Amino acid sequence: MFIIGTGTATPPHRYRQQECWTTLKASARFGEMNVRSKAIMKKVLMGDNGIATRHLALDQLDHAFEITPDALHARFIKNAPMLATQAAERALAAAKINPPEIDAVLISTCTGYLCPGLTSYASERLGLRPDVLALDLVGQGCGAALPNLQTAQALVASGHYGRVLSICVEVCSAAFYLDDDAGVLISACLFGDGAGAAVLSPTAGSGRRVKWKSCGSLLQSGDRDCLRFEQKNGMLRNILTPQVPALAAQHCETVFADTLARNQVKRRQISGWIFHPGGRDVLLALREKFQLSSHDVRQSEAVLRDHGNMSSPSVLFVLQAALAEGAPGGLWWMSSFGAGFSCHGALLEVE
């Protein structure tokens, strides 16, 4: 399987972290927080956390405090189909593929629920064929891009589906929740909105040759409570614990070692690193575990700086950035991780 085109999309409104702090301080919600919570929010929004700006599906920042089930769902249904469609259109254009040529579409999300799913909306807007195979994948959190691509690879390998459209879209601002839990507060300061897409084909395209060589996954259910969504008061509430950076690095290294061993590849052969930018501390833990420099993970750091953690689309933003930069070819390691606790990785052969 080859990745023959990628595309990304974000909401039009982009906010600096300092703007978020200023708006929060002026809100009624801020007055309801305890002293510790206020200090956490100030430290994360005003400190050096690796994030400068985030794109949010909010016409005004103070709309972030409209935290009711109906308001959050309305935000998701308004923005998720639009972002998914925009990213897909750009991926199709990059691949030089017309929508009717797509045989299957897969969409991953964890920040909202629709029935029929997002594939119904995106397929209609894109003009995909009525007989397209449409699969909605949910519940995989920040790591969803790689399982989505693994599913696409299985469809392509079956010989029944030629070109597959893979989309990840998250409206994290439709899953904001505020209380005095540190993980909840940090989540509100960390996550942004966006969508990423890729077109997959059994043959290479006209651009850079990106071959899906091999992949691996790891599911550690014993660590489930370290990172997951729960339902509270009819809304999603993110559980984010301090163990996440270490767990991400540990499990990523396990998947990496297993995948390389199966493919008889040595670590020194890896020339590119495409990591999900889960946060500053996550990237630092990955750098330490893999003995990498800031330059090695520069695309991940840049995506985090400009967009925050967008959950599942983030790693597709990093891949697109590396390709656009003209990063040296060879074997690239692409990895995502998230709720489960799950971790996924893929070897890409790039020319």
Predicted regions and their residues:
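Active-site-adjacent elements of ketosynthase-type condensing enzymes
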Residues: 114-120, 166-186, 216-233, 279-288, ...
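Short coil/turn connectors at secondary-structure junctions
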Residues: 99-103, 130-133, 158-164, 185-186, ...
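Claisen-condensing/thiolase-fold acyl-transfer catalytic domains that form or cleave C-C bonds
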Residues: 92, 110-111, 121-124, 129-131, ...
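Short, well-ordered amphipathic alpha-helical segments that serve as non-catalytic structural scaffolds
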Residues: 57, 80-95, 151, 195, ...
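Condensing-enzyme catalytic core mediating Claisen C-C bond formation in acyl metabolism
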Residues: 1-78, 172, 178-250, 254, ...
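Short beta-strand segments
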Residues: 5-7, 108, 138, 165-170, ...
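Conserved beta-ketoacyl condensing-enzyme motif
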Residues: 41-134, 139, 267-283
